[in-house]
Amino acid sequence: MAAKDDLILTIDSDGDEIVYSEESEAEVEISVKKVKNKKNKKSKAQPQQKEEDEEKNEDINPNFIFSLDGIETTSKFDGWDFSVDRNANEVANKEVDLDGILRRKGGLVSLAGSDAQKEEEVEDEEEEENDEDIQNEDEDEGEEELALDGFGMGAEEKVIDEEDEEDEEDENDKSDGEDDKDTEVEVSEEGEEENDEDTAEAMAEFYADEKETKSAKSQVHTTFQTLQLSRPVLKGLSQLGYTKPSPIQSASIPIALLGRDIVAGAVTGSGKTAAYMIPIIERLLYKPSKVASTRVIVLTPTRELAIQVGDVGKKIGQFVNNLNFGLAVGGLNLRQQEQQLKSRPDVVIATPGRLIDHIRNSPSFSIDSLEVLVIDEADRMLDEGFQVELTEILSLIPKNKRQTLLFSATMNTKIQDLIQLSLQRPVRIMIDPPKTAATKLTQEFVRIRKRDHLKPALLFQLLKKLDPAQQSRIVVFVSRKESAHKLRIVLGLLGMKVSELHGSLTQEQRLNNVNDFKKLIVPVLICTDLAARGLDIPKIEIVINYDMPKSHEVYLHRVGRTARAGRDGTSISFVGESTSDRNIVKDAIKSLEGGEVKGKAVSRNIDWVDVEQLNKIVESKQEIIEEVLDEEKQAKEILQAEMQLAKASNMMKHEKEIQSRPKRTWFESEKDKKKHQTEVMQQLTKHGKKVNSKKRKAIEVKKDDGGRSYKKTKVDRITDQKRNPKAKIGNGSSKGGKRRK
């Protein structure tokens, strides 16, 4: 038996095959029988389990949603953080150190009109409390609903090469001059608002069926997951802390995913940027991976808005593979942008002038494969100043199979302007703007009367009283750039840290000032309406209207910077004696009296004796203010001379290389450009004066009609009566018939 057990069978052994096959078949038969027995048992138990499952399902919430990849919404997202890449070889541009000048003149040391020791004690106590406040802020930030058009400005600016600086400055003036203009909101002399309404027939002829619009607005999505978005996009949204889409997003995203053209209107802060960026990223998930091409172009009126949109797209698409964004805006390095556009990024965010410049002069940049065109802030893009640039861009962009998305805070343009955009049966989505302020906003009004000269001292007294430790974000709105700059100097000499934001600053200065304000390095930001448009920084506690706006809508836009997402906020307005100022106050009070809003509108009591004492200090520093302005002007001239000297030396060193470069071209000659500007000014002015909206509208209608309309003369009326004598005797169809009766 031992020998038989030790016997090793060969491959040719028949016994091995027979024994192995019999055993395997037996095992298979046994396993099959066991499975059949299990199935029989299961089939018998099925009716009982069905009854139990039905009882359990009654307790299950049908609206339950699983957490995506186990990622919870972040609670530490503090606004948009955008950064601009910088080459290691680049040297930062020199700017005038205004703070250094103010320190040499005795400013930025201690607050005027207060005891320095008391201020130091207050600062020590505030530092201890601030550590606790920072922890509480991190916990509370998850409760804040940040507007999707907000952004952080943590950017280091790209710097222009010295030999290219003057050329690029000329191009910026030519292509993006619109970014540096601070224009006031136009209001008619009679207080009438411009209202370009189209007939119902024309709108029905141009827009898609109203049923689509109604169905789009009626769809209410409680979460982004019900929008049937892909997992990478949902993951990016969850990382940003966004779970519930806003009304404009809920209505426009499904339509945009179908490839339809959209004309959408919603107020600033409603999430317009994500409303078009989410469907764009969703569409780019299915792009051909082998061929790199620019498929999306987003047009914005300002540089800051373009940089913000780029950061929003990067944050939402951070988990999408091979998704690239490019930037084409003025004020940044032109050569570096050309290198970036050579890689043909999927999405290019641009201002109109710089985009035309790159299309005409950058050899490797092509838009032949463009699929989606987005026009953000369309109300400004369709103004007379941008009309020529838009026409040129639309003539260069392919029309076939192109989806056009048009978004705006206000939409009062004519049908003919939209037809020029080559929209094909667009779906019209208009979300009604709020005509009242936030519920937890306290609106305070200070009646200035005939004390306009005390406004700088009044502003300093309020800032010192409201925020003695300078730990709150305060935005001060002014109407002019000169006022913003002078206020910064005055408050700086009085010992207060202040920054400014307006069109006269360079791009690097703008970004640095907003970044310092966001990080509370500088707690007060003085800005104009145009510079602050589209800018949304979280947790602004106080808004001060140093100069009242021109309309109630602009007033709501200003005070809407604070009291967001159920937080408390305060707005303080310096009200003058003009009719427009009083009307704004009346409208604000009326909105509260209607019972729709629970906010408060109060008159703030001011210690005018203290303000007059502070005004004496301000007046005593008038000579120092003039010295600061002169020194700043001289420093700017020195920097300009140094730049010209560096450029001349570079021209001598690299003369052949610079002359070998092809000359950059523009679609308009200087003669045509001046002609267009004069035509625009003629439409806006008459005999050197501003024309109100009613008269300007009549001028436009007359221009469109192409001349004076024909009116019947007396001879024509007599001949008509002779042809139709019954009209003379009949029902009094003519005035002559009535007289004869």
From Swiss-Prot:
Q: Which residue windows does the record flag with biased composition (Basic residues)? A: 35-44, 686-697
Q: What Pfam family is a match, any one?
A: DEAD
Q: Which GO terms describe its biological process?
A: rRNA processing
Enumerate the residue ranges of region (Disordered).
35-63, 106-200, 650-741
Q: Where is the composition biased (Basic and acidic residues)?
A: 652-672, 698-723
Chain coiled-coil ranges? 610-657
Subcellular location per UniProt equals: Nucleus, Nucleolus
Could you tell me the EC number(s) of this protein? 3.6.4.13
What protein family is recorded? Belongs to the DEAD box helicase family. DDX27/DRS1 subfamily.
Q: What protein does this entry describe?
A: ATP-dependent RNA helicase DRS1
Q: Which organism is it from?
A: Scheffersomyces stipitis (strain ATCC 58785 / CBS 6054 / NBRC 10063 / NRRL Y-11545) (Yeast)
Gene coding for it: DRS1
